Design a protein with these regions (language model features):
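N-terminal alpha-helical transmembrane segments of multi-pass membrane transport
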Residues: 1-60
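Juxtamembrane loop-helix boundary motifs flanking transmembrane segments in multi-pass membrane proteins
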Residues: 19, 23, 27, 54, ...
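Transmembrane-helix bundle segments that line or gate the permeation/cavity pathway
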Residues: 40-81, 85-88, 92-122, 147-171
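Juxtamembrane inter-helical linkers in multi-pass membrane proteins
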Residues: 69, 115-137, 173-183
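Membrane-embedded alpha-helical bundles of multi-pass integral membrane proteins
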Residues: 86-87, 92, 138, 186-196
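Conserved small/polar residues in nucleotide/adenosyl-binding loops
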Residues: 199-200
Length: 201
């Protein structure tokens, strides 16, 4: 995982070394960027599974990552509990990022350009349409993620009240907030008491 992190950081520094010029994303560019972004991010996202050897097949690792980022919820893992704590967290975290949209997440943390990113946001965001909540798309993305983070935190707290262990509560909340359903137990919520099931409902 350390190798993947270092590679990603190095590439990030390379691309951020040159300040981008002001430009506007039109719908065509937004759709193309979204498609390319999904491919690149999915490849990088599957590397922790593959390099760690916990999912030895690159194809299976890529499938699991794409399923996470797209919040599909399909899995190639016969035994979810065979993954390490770190990999299970990453698996659920891909769901959390994908629940709001991978590129919306990037818009929230990275200034992609000085121009307008509304069409990039429209191409990536879930739902029928995206309006400007605030004048700048980066601020809109941040606002959406603040709300998203708040709802996730509330779920974690409620699960803790239901006597779920902290690690389980965090991973489960990441998986359910993105509406994908990735979990860390083979028998899902049957491992916990009834109050946990009611919390998720």
């Amino acid at each position: 995982e350390t190798v993947v992190a270092l590679i990603s950081i190095a590439i990030g520094f390379i691309f951020s070394a040159k300040k981008p010029r002001d430009f506007t994303f039109y719908l065509k560019e937004g759709c193309a960027t979204t498609a390319l972004g999904w491919i690149v991010l999915s490849i990088f996202g599957c590397l922790p599974f593959y390099i760690s050897g916990e999912i030895p097949s690159f194809t299976d690792a890529l499938f699991e990552t794409i399923s996470g980022f797209t919040t599909t919820g399909a899995s190639i893992l016969p035994e979810v509990e065979s993954l390490s704590y770190c990999m299970n967290f990453w698996r659920c975290f891909t769901h959390w990022i994908g629940g709001m949209g991978v590129l919306v997440f990037l818009l929230a943390i990275i200034p992609l350009s000085g121009g307008s990113n509304i069409n990039l946001m429209r191409a990536e965001s879930p739902g029928p349409s995206v309006g400007k909540l605030v004048p700048k798309m980066r601020h809109t993305a941040r606002l959406l993620y603040i709300i998203y983070f708040g709802l996730t935190t509330m779920e974690i707290i409620f699960l803790l009240f239901g006597k779920m262990p902290l690690y389980d509560a965090i991973c489960t909340s990441l998986g359910t907030a993105g509406t994908g359903g990735f979990g860390i137990k083979n028998d899902s919520f049957c491992s916990y008491n009834v109050s946990v099931s009611y919390t998720h409902l």
